[in-house]
Amino acid sequence: MRVLLIACGATKLDHPAPASEIYTGSLTRAAIRHAIATGLPWYIVSAMHGLVDPAQVLEPYNVSIADLDRDYRPIWARQVAGRLALLHPACSVVEAHLGESYLRALRPFLPPVEDPLQGLGIGHRLRWYAERRS
């Protein structure tokens, strides 16, 4: 079973909203549209909240993985991976739509990871999503 993990984003609404709506940046919105279109289970990865269900209501916040102490990052990553394993014990592949810092922290604790956007800058990532919408 494949599960998609989507990066959170720095740009957010200024009021509480479901995780699927609170992030307003173009890259995060494109990744969410892609995840929905696949019909596969998907979650948002947040430095503050860990593995976030798209329906979970979040308050606006301003925390990224760069804000987490380096010694805490493996603990955070184990928590994210552990929650994923509880929710989807049959998950055999994670399709990661994450920034490099998040992926570097998480990869050792996840099932095999596919990174379809590896090496792509923001513009190329947006194009990748746009090509899959048409």
Model-derived regions, located:
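Peripheral peptide segments
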Residues: M1-S134
